[in-house]
């Protein structure tokens, strides 16, 4: 757990999954934990590398959701990765607290979590050194982006209005910005589902892991 929260975002999803059964683990959970440990042993020298650039350090946050990814409960998984100086500084992978009835709903829930995180990080960075840039949240779902930017009320999203109103408010206030990102470059994808080796390595590079 310490490695997952401190230096290894690449195992965040795997650790999140096995942590769901802490109260009643079975043999399959033991197998999964051993697999994680073998992976860590084989990548023991992996760590986050930061490459600060003078006047060019941007706070970026990637938000993603795997709709209905938990086959036991039907709940979606939220993945968020925030980077600064080309390296991950904050991340989490967690199962959403209720069932999302659509991909858009799952993405909006994830975006609201990302917004809370990036607003907190912005204030933290501003306490350390003056930080005037507007941090950006990158989302690979166009409907979720439209909800964040559109001031009109949508009846079909009434059940999640608090979530998208929160994101929209922060966008309108200039606290955060939202951008579209292709699925290929959606870094948070690594925190919502199990990925094959080549794809995981690609996203690890984007998180500054090397």
Describe every region a protein language model picked out.
Residues 1-12, 66-69, 77, 104-120:
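Conserved pre-motif C helix in the palm subdomain of viral-like polymerases
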Residues 21, 58, 94-210:
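RNase H-like nuclease module associated with reverse transcription
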Residues 61-104:
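RNase H-like nuclease fold core
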């Amino acid at each position: 757990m310490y490695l997952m929260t401190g230096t290894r975002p690449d195992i965040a999803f795997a650790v999140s999954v096995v942590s769901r059964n802490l109260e009643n683990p079975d043999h399959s959970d033991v197998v999964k934990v051993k697999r994680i440990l073998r992976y860590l042993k084989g990548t023991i020298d992996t760590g986050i590398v930061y490459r600060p650039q003078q006047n060019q350090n941007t706070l970026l946050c990637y938000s993603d959701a795997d709709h209905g990814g938990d086959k036991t409960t039907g709940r979606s998984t939220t993945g968020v990765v925030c980077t600064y100086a080309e390296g991950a500084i904050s991340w989490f992978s967690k199962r959403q607290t209720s069932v999302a009835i659509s991909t858009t709903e799952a993405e909006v829930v994830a975006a609201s979590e990302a917004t809370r995180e990036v607003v907190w990080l912005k204030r933290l960075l501003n306490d350390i050194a003056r930080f005037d840039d507007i941090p950006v949240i990158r989302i690979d779902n166009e409907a979720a982006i439209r909800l964040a930017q559109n001031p009109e009320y949508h009846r079909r999203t009434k059940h999640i209005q608090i979530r998208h109103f929160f994101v929209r408010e922060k966008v309108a206030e200039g606290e955060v910005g939202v951008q579209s990102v292709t699925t290929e470059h959606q870094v948070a994808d690594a925190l919502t589902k199990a990925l094959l080796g080549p794809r995981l390595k690609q996203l690890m590079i984007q998180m500054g892991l090397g």
